[in-house]
Each structure stands twice: as structure tokens, then as C-alpha cells.
């Protein structure tokens, strides 16, 4: 009877202290990933140091699924520079190129952007009544990229069941691996 139970429930044969150790190991993996992310945030100066290009608006510079590394260094922005910005009321950041910079008398400046593959500037994407972006909208400058690496993120976003399935499989794998 015990043999049948151990085949049905593979965790029944594992000592409780080993299960606890596996749970701690899983927690350490999650904590390490969070620390790496926080470290990237501090090192890059950006709230989102890595983003995935979600549309084709920046073709030929970037394609859907490219993974961008961002940096938010001090210094003036330049026309032609690729930036990532967030619009109030929209949760997904946008990757586009600076089209115009309007310097104001107080030393601050306004920025207008456009996707390389778009026919018009981004004023239509901004909040109603907004004509320019300020520095506060910019979350980073594109400093490097890895082609197509972000497609995994896009597939998981498009098929959320796959994301939960993969997390479940990884959790079972980590918890059931014996050391």
C-alpha cells in the first residue's frame, strides 16, 4: 500500500526537512532575481532598466521582440536619440526616437517623439491636450539591445496560460529536485 501511495504522491517519500530546504532554495532563487533587478535599476538609473519592443513602430532600428537595455544618465537629450517613455494613464512604455526638442526660458525643455516606422509624430499617443513630453515622462535611453530575446515575454503575454504553466513546472522542478 505504501508503495502505491509513494507512486501517486512523489512528495510523500521526501523527508519534511528536505521539502523545507527546497522551499527555502526556491525563495532564494526568487530573492536573487529581485536583487539583480534592483541592482540593474540602481546601476542604470532607470526604473525599468530592461524593456521589450512590443510593436513594429521602430523598424528598421528595432524589431518586435528585441530586448533593450536602458540607462538614464544625466545630460541633455539629443534629436535622434532613442528613448523609452511612459504616458499618464497608460501602463506600457513606448520606445521611440526624439524628433524635436523645444528649450524653454527656464532651462527645461520639451520633447516630441516619433516611431521610425510611423508616418506622424507621437502627439496622438500623448495624453489628451498634451503636445510635448517632459523629462519626467522619460524612463530611459536605449543603450544596447539583444535581437529577438524578448519574444519569450511577448508569447507569455499573448498566452497567459503558458506563463502560469511554466511557473508551475519550474516550481515543481525546484521543489522536487533532490540534493
UniProtKB/Swiss-Prot annotation:
Q: Which Pfam families match?
A: Peptidase_S24
On subunit structure and binding partners, the annotation says: Component of the signal peptidase complex (SPC) composed of a catalytic subunit sec11 and three accessory subunits spcs1, spcs2 and spcs3. The complex induces a local thinning of the ER membrane which is used to measure the length of the signal peptide (SP) h-region of protein substrates. This ensures the selectivity of the complex towards h-regions shorter than 18-20 amino acids.
Q: What does the comment on domains in this protein's record state? A: The C-terminal short (CTS) helix is essential for catalytic activity. It may be accommodated as a transmembrane helix in the thinned membrane environment of the complex, similarly to the signal peptide in the complex substrates.
Family membership: Belongs to the peptidase S26B family.
Chief subcellular site? endoplasmic reticulum
| UniProt-recorded name of the protein | Signal peptidase complex catalytic subunit sec11
List UniProt keywords, sorted A-Z.
Answer: Endoplasmic reticulum, Hydrolase, Membrane, Protease, Signal-anchor, Transmembrane, Transmembrane helix
Q: What SUPFAM superfamilies does the entry give?
A: LexA/Signal peptidase
Membrane side Cytoplasmic: residue ranges: 1-22
Q: Name one GO biological process term.
A: signal peptide processing
One function term, GO molecular function aspect: serine-type endopeptidase activity
Q: What is its EC number?
A: 3.4.21.89
InterPro entries per UniProt = LexA/Signal_pep-like_sf, Peptidase_S24_S26A/B/C, Peptidase_S26B
Q: What is the role of the protein in this entry?
A: Catalytic component of the signal peptidase complex (SPC) which catalyzes the cleavage of N-terminal signal sequences from nascent proteins as they are translocated into the lumen of the endoplasmic reticulum. Specifically cleaves N-terminal signal peptides that contain a hydrophobic alpha-helix (h-region) shorter than 18-20 amino acids.
Recorded GO cellular component terms are:
signal peptidase complex
Indicate how the chain sits in the lipid bilayer.
Single-pass type II membrane protein
Q: Which residues form the signal peptide?
A: none
- Subcellular localization: Endoplasmic reticulum membrane
Active-site residues from the entry: 57 (charge relay system), 96 (charge relay system), 122 (charge relay system)
Q: Mark the transmembrane ranges.
A: 23-43
- Please indicate the ranges of residues that lie on the Lumenal side: 44-179
- Going by the record, the broad EC class of this enzyme is hydrolase
Q: Which reaction does it catalyse?
A: Cleavage of hydrophobic, N-terminal signal or leader sequences from secreted and periplasmic proteins
Ranges for region C-terminal short (CTS) helix: 165-176
Amino acid at each position: 500500500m505504501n508503495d502505491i501511495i509513494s507512486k501517486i504522491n512523489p512528495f510523500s517519500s521526501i523527508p519534511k526537512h528536505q521539502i523545507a530546504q527546497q522551499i527555502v532554495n526556491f525563495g532564494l532563487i526568487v530573492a536573487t532575481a529581485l536583487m539583480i533587478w534592483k541592482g540593474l535599476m540602481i546601476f542604470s538609473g532607470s526604473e525599468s532598466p530592461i524593456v521589450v519592443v512590443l510593436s513594429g513602430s521602430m523598424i528598421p532600428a528595432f524589431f518586435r521582440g528585441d530586448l533593450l537595455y536602458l540607462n538614464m544618465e544625466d545630460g541633455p537629450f539629443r534629436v535622434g536619440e532613442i528613448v523609452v517613455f511612459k504616458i499618464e494613464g497608460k501602463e506600457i512604455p513606448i520606445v521611440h526616437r526624439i524628433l524635436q526638442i523645444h528649450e524653454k526660458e527656464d532651462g527645461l525643455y520639451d520633447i516630441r517623439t516619433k516611431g521610425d516606422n510611423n508616418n506622424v509624430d507621437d502627439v496622438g499617443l500623448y495624453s489628451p491636450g498634451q503636445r510635448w513630453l517632459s523629462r519626467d515622462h522619460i524612463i530611459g535611453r536605449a543603450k544596447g539591445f539583444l535581437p529577438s530575446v524578448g519574444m519569450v515575454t511577448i508569447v507569455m503575454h499573448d498566452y497567459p496560460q503558458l506563463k502560469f504553466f511554466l511557473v508551475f513546472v519550474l516550481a515543481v522542478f525546484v521543489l522536487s529536485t533532490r540534493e
